[in-house]
C-alpha cells in the first residue's frame, strides 16, 4: 500500500511539472463535475452542466429549494426522480438515491463528507437547509472520487458561495400547519475587496404532528390518538454558521464553523415503556418534549482553499466534526437487565478528522486530469445503559486519478481509478449487569469482542459523453465499494426504536457494486426530455436478515450478505407552451432481487415503489422589475408495493394533490418573497412504504399548509 501511495504522489508531481510548461491557462469548462467552478466561472448552460459528468447529474439552485420547502432538506428535494426522503416524522428525514440510503450514499458540504451517525434510522441529517445555496446530486456509484459510502450516489451541498454585494442579507419566516411549526432564518453577508463573510441563524419549533386517523395498530395493540396527533413528536432545532473567506485572482480560502442542534421526541406509544405504565401525561400538551427523546448536536469546522501554480489548479480541504447524540428513555428492566439508574439510554460521541488534496490540469489541450489524495479518521465512544454498537476507530486513506479526454467539444471519454485502505478497530464491551450462564455463576456477558479489520479496494470507471444538436447521450460503467460499518460488524443488542434484536457479523466482506448507467437528453425552446436508466449488480450486498429466533424476547435479525441485482429508470419531461405555461411529467421505477442466500427471490428491505408526478405550472410577471410569480398544481401517484421482505408489510398505492404558489415583490432596494404550499390538499390517508413509522401503521400527514415569507436586502 505504501508503494502505491508513493507512486500516486510521484504521479501528481510529474503532472504538475508537465502542466507548468504549458503557456495557456486551462479551459475551466474542461474540468470535472465541480459545482464551485460552475458558479464562479458563470458556466451555467444546460449543455455544459450535462457534459461535466458521464453520470446522471442534477443541479438545484436556492430558488427551487425555497419553492418546494418542506420540514427538512431531503423532503424539499424528494420531488427529483431517483431521490427519496426516508421520513422520520414530519420534520426529519434521511436521504436515499435510487433506493440506497444510510451508509450507501454520501452527503458532502462544500466538498467535505458529512459524518454523523448515518446508520441510525431514527434521526435526520444534521444540516441547516436555509444555509444551503445550491445542491448538486450525482445519481449512481461515486466511490471513485468520494470513497466508501458513495456506492449509491452523492448529494453535494454548497453553502460557501461568495456574496455579490458589500452588504446583503435575507430574513425568512416560515410556518407549517401539520405540526404547528414556526421558524425564523436570518442571513447577513458581504464582501470588501477580496474578503467576504456570511452568517446564518435558524430557529425552528414544532408540536406533535397530525395524521389522518384516530388510532393505529402497533403489533396486536390498538392505540387511540388524541386529536389525531402522534404523542411526543414535538421538537426544536437551533442552527448557526459563520463563514469568512478570501477570494483572490490566484488564491482563495474560506473558513466555516457551523453548529446544528436538534431535540425531538420519539412517538411515546412505540418506544420504551408503555404509555399506560408511564407517569408522564403525554396528552397534557402537544408542545412538550418528554421522554423518550433524543438530543443531537453537530459541530463542524472546515477550511477550503484553492490556488494555481502555473497551469495547475490545486484544492485542499481540512475539517473537524463532532457529533454528539444522546437518547433518553424512562428506565425499565428488560430480560436480565435490572432497572437502570437513570434516563440516559445511549450516548454517542463521534469525532471525525478529514484532510484532502486535489489537483486539476489540462494536458496537451485535450486531457483534463483530476487527481488527489485524502485521509479520514473517525473516533466513536458510547455510554448509557443500552447497547447496540461498540466503541470504534476507523482510519481510511486513498488516492484517485480521473481523466477526461476531449476528442472534440461534443465527444468526451472519461476514465478513472481509485485505491483505498480502511482500518477499523472495534473495542470489547461487557454488560453492566450479570446474566446467568448454565453450569456456572452469573457473568458480565461480552456483547462485542475486540476486533481489527483491514480492507483494501481498487475501483474504476469508464464513461462517455456525446452531444449532437439538441441531443446529449451519456454512458458510464464502473465498480464501487463500501466497507462494512462497525454496526454491521459488531452490533449485539436490542434496538428499542423498532423492537428487534440486532446481531453483527465480524467476518463480513467489503460490499462491491458493478453498475452501468445510460442517459438520453433532448432540448429545444419548448421541450426538455431527460431519461436515465441503470443496472446494478452486487456480488455481496450487506443487509439485516430477519430470523424466526428470539433473543431476550425479541425477534433476532443478523447481518449477512447475498448477491443482488437492481435496475431502474427515471424520466423528467418538461413542455412549455402558451408562453407562460409549463407541463411537467416525472417518474421513476426500481426493481431489486436477491439472487442468493436465505431470502433468494425476495426484493431488498424497504424498496421504494414506482411513482409518477404530473404538474402544471403558470408563471407571471415580466421579471424586469424583479417581480415574478407562479402557480402550480401537482398530482402524485405512487404504486403498490407488494414485493417485500418479511416482516415488512405490503403498502397500497395512493394519489395526492399538491398546490403551490409564489410571488416576488420589489420593495425599495429589496425583494419581498411569498411562497404558499398546500400538500395533500384532499386529506388522503396513505402510507409511505419507506417511512420510519410504516411498520406500526402510522399514515403520512394529512392536509398540510405551509407559508414562507422572505425579505432579501
Name what the model sees in each region.
Residues 232, 342-358, 503-510, 515-516, ...:
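Outer membrane beta-barrel strand-and-loop segments of large Gram-negative receptors
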Residues 35-66, 94:
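N-terminal periplasmic "start-of-domain" segments of outer-membrane beta-barrel proteins
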Residues 113-139:
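Short acidic/polar hinge/loop motifs at secondary-structure boundaries
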Residues 21-24, 231-237, 251-310, 314, ...:
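Flexible loop and strand-edge segments within Gram-negative outer membrane beta-barrel domains
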Residues 377-380, 423-448, 452, 466-516, ...:
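Surface-exposed extracellular loop regions of Gram-negative outer-membrane beta-barrel proteins
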Residues 409, 534-538, 555-641:
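Gram-negative outer-membrane beta-barrel transporters
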Residues 206-212, 537-540, 583, 637-642, ...:
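C-terminal beta-signal and adjacent terminal beta-strands/loops
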Residues 179-205, 218-267, 297-299, 306-309, ...:
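Transmembrane beta-barrel wall of Gram-negative outer-membrane proteins
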